[in-house]
Amino acid sequence: MTQLAIGKPTPLGAHYDGQGVNFTLFSAHAERVELCVFDANGQEHRYDLPGHSGDIWHGYLPDARPGLRYGYRVHGPWQPAEGHRFNPAKLLIDPCARQIDGEFKDNPLLHAGHNEPDYRDNASIAPKCVVVVDHYDWEDDAPPRMPWGCTIIYEAHVKGLTYLHPEIPVEIRGTYKALGHPVMINYLKQLGITALELLPVAQFASEPRLQRMGLSNYWGYNPVAMFALHPAYACSPETALDEFRDAIKALHKAGIEVILDIVLNHSAELDLDGPLFSLRGIDNRSYYWIREDGDYHNWTGCGNTLNLSHPAVVDYASACLRYWVETCHVDGFRFDLAAVMGRTPEFRQDAPLFTAIQNCPVLSQVKLIAEPWDIAPGGYQVGNFPPLFAEWNDHFRDAARRFWLHYDLPLGAFAGRFAASSDVFKRNGRLPSAAINLVTAHDGFTLRDCVCFNHKHNEANGEENRDGTNNNYSNNHGKEGLGGTLDLVERRRDSIHALLTTLLLSQGTPMLLAGDEHGHSQRGNNNAYCQDNQLTWLDWSQASSGLTAFTAALIHLRKRIPALMENRWWEEGDGNVRWLNRYAQPLSTDEWQNGPKQLQILLSDRFLIAINATLEVTEIVLPAGEWHAIPPFAGEDNPVITAVWQGPAHGLCVFQR
């Protein structure tokens, strides 16, 4: 039987050098680590890792080749009160595995035990890691390096974006390949998108609870192997990595960046009753935040929380991020529940992972976007992330909806959000682009549902409509649900136009949810995380071409306005912005706080956004000069307006002088 050589303690994971494979695994509390390899017949062969450098266990298997399936058995104490849950009867996934063979099914054998260990062996059904070799021809690929001030983000799901697209070949719909198909790329270019932000593509598992209900995790925020691509989005699991890189290369050639939504806050092992896949059995005490009683701190709402202040876990997370940049050429990350990244356990801007990213010559050069909260006390950290990060701006989302759909936001508050929320983000040398403005996202109502539903309708999720937020700031315009009279449809359309205009012509970095430009509806489901079906897949055959054209025209208009593209804070008198009332005069203090919802925003002294958010037709006196409405607010025959715009109720228009 082949013997393992000691090998090297770096890099993490399994790496083929042409002669064999080097294996490394971190565990500070293990007493012994077995490498388990499986031949073509499924026969298991076990080897003790002979090397032990600090907390890294390692060994080298001569003559091993790519395609080898493997896992680990980790020996150590079973002491739940101290946070130790070692169980060598369970085969474990390498946290740095780059490919997984097998499915993460709901099976009692994939549990370690709660108070007492479950010593039933699970190697026959446990997923296995696969050794991969990294040879890929990137040709002349180069990152687009789109300046932040010019960035337009499009948030999309790999499958949902293309699964029903009639012009994409059936055999690749819903896959990585479809992202790089010319039809998809041409669409994104025509729309004006500069960055495609993908919901999680790292391998994830469906929670046992969902599997028992016949559902699955659709969004992907339940990670199990952070270095491995989710195989369900590939035409073939064996070629997933190349399919993904082909798509990125094609998008880059079109000048479109790729941003990955990544989940560095919890794992699919969930709470103590959850499955055992990897980290819990490798070194539970190090990988997770553990309470004094040995249970998990659940600061994520998912049962566990990664301890990203532990040096080894910081190294793991940093290596993961570098892998996606260096191996797949991704251009940035959106971090789910990113406040966890800064916990020590208190949130700190100089937390170890933040410091590691800032000091890394690779990671410090890509786009970094935080979802700036978690669910723990002190978890709401909007505006408090380090300068390298942009942040989701929920202030903007709520303000835009309240102003246009609830009519209860003063002009001053609306203007503050329109101006990149400088009260929140203008600190530590940050620029307006640090504010990622959004009206909708994957989590919550779609834009169409914002104007069609007053209440969530999440019954299909199997939780009796308890899940999902109740704070939607939506307005059904008088009738719950889709459809209605022509007048109702037109009023809803006007609200959609107003919200899109606010999003795409405001200062900051706009993020558009895929499908909003089509009029996509999830029929009132504002938490469709487990709906892998036509509720979430974009139906291109039903897309509103008029709304798509309206959205594209807004994006292209944005790119013509210097005040929005220069990424500089607006200052009084700098010519970037003037705020005027309905009479084209500067607003008084009282008008800012108590005035009617009528406002004129003059950008770069040439572009005028006239707003009448009241319920009555109102005359808006335009500033001096000859003005004409511009697309998407007027057709080819634009009359010159020299004095007054008859502002329709709940309407707005953009003019150019």
From Swiss-Prot:
The record marks 443 as: Transition state stabilizer. Transmembrane segments: none annotated. The active site is at residues 336, 371. It catalyses: Hydrolysis of (1->6)-alpha-D-glucosidic linkages to branches with degrees of polymerization of three or four glucose residues in limit dextrin. Pathway: Glycan degradation; glycogen degradation. It holds the Pfam family Alpha-amylase. Residues 460-479 are annotated as: Disordered. One of its GO terms (molecular function) is hydrolase activity, hydrolyzing O-glycosyl compounds. Keywords: Carbohydrate metabolism, Glycogen metabolism, Glycosidase, Hydrolase. One of its GO terms (biological process) is glycogen catabolic process. It comes from the Bacteria. Its EC number is 3.2.1.196. It is an enzyme of class 3 (hydrolase). The keyword Hydrolase applies. Belongs to the glycosyl hydrolase 13 family. Removes maltotriose and maltotetraose chains that are attached by 1,6-alpha-linkage to the limit dextrin main chain, generating a debranched limit dextrin. PANTHER family: GLYCOGEN DEBRANCHING ENZYME. This is Glycogen debranching enzyme. The gene is glgX.
